Design a protein with these regions (language model features):
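Fe(II)/2-oxoglutarate oxygenase catalytic core
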Residues: 1-132
């Protein structure tokens, strides 16, 4: 017997309805900029982690849940609706702080997969990644 994914499932979803107002966007930007900034790194591949300017050139900070509670509630609502309509995972919840990223002129983040394929640390937990 071969088990396949249901035909209704999607693997990439794009939403075009605005989630945040311009004022809310500015509040998120301010929250991200007020946190400690660090050079973005890459990781997950054996022997290749840390700063890799061929894959990524940007600066990041992490937005604490307590700093933007309403933002996280709004994102979770969209995530749960999107999950129900396209993926069907059980018990979805936000477990990671939002990563705020700024790109200098010429900065970028090349195509990548957020996972540790070798599973040296622990099994992957992230089911859905979202970009705002």
């Amino acid at each position: 017997m071969i088990i396949t994914e249901p035909k209704w499932k999607s693997y990439m979803v794009e939403t075009t309805t605005p989630i945040f107002t311009p004022k809310q966007c500015q509040m998120i930007i301010n929250a991200g900029r007020s946190e400690p900034k660090q050079n973005a790194s890459v990781g997950g591949r054996e022997g290749k982690s840390g700063i890799d300017t061929e894959t990524r050139t940007s600066h990041i900070s992490w937005i604490p849940f307590s700093k933007t509670t309403e933002m996280y509630k709004d994102i979770e609502k969209v995530m749960k609706t999107t999950n129900g309509n396209h993926f069907g995972f059980d018990g979805m919840q936000i477990t990671e702080m939002a990563q705020y990223t700024e790109y200098p002129e010429g900065g970028f983040y090349d195509w990548h997969m957020d996972c540790d394929l070798i599973m040296t640390k622990e099994p992957p937990v992230r089911k859905i990644s979202m970009t705002l």
